[in-house]
């Protein structure tokens, strides 16, 4: 605009770009994101990871407000240890969640399992503090929230 003097914030906002990654499967998406962040000085957003995690955290925050509960005390089960599930777990923990258990098609993710990819091994170190073992059915016992980001129909009434 003529006569408009840019301030520092406008210069920072409008002079930068970002990278939006879309539909890149795990575990490749984690390595691509990591390398881009290392090599480029711009934000990297992976819709499947970060977009999903943001929406889930918003829903969790609202449900906790309605039920007058604290995120640190709530128990979360995330079914699906791919890009979305891992990112949801990370964001929940950054928001203060202490009790997050992840489940994949083989069962509850534990640090000692050898079949996991690097991203799953990393998240296994900071989740499942109760050292649960077993299946999804075992994981959801006593849980306050179930977050499903895998195949449909895996959670049954039983």
Q: What is each of the regions a protein language model found here?
A:
Residues 45, 101-103, 147:
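Hydrophobic/aromatic beta-strand patches that form the interior of the parallel beta-sheet core
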Residues 32-35, 39, 140-142, 151-158:
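Rossmann-fold NAD(P) dinucleotide-binding segment
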Residues 22, 148-149:
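Short, well-ordered coil/turn residues at beta-beta hairpins
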Residues 1-74:
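Glycine/serine-rich phosphate-binding loop and adjoining beta1-alpha1 elements at the start
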Residues 30-31, 88, 112, 156-158:
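Short glycine-/acidic-enriched loop or helix-start segments at secondary-structure transitions
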Residues 54-143:
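Glycine-rich phosphate/diphosphate-binding loop of Rossmann-like nucleotide-binding domains
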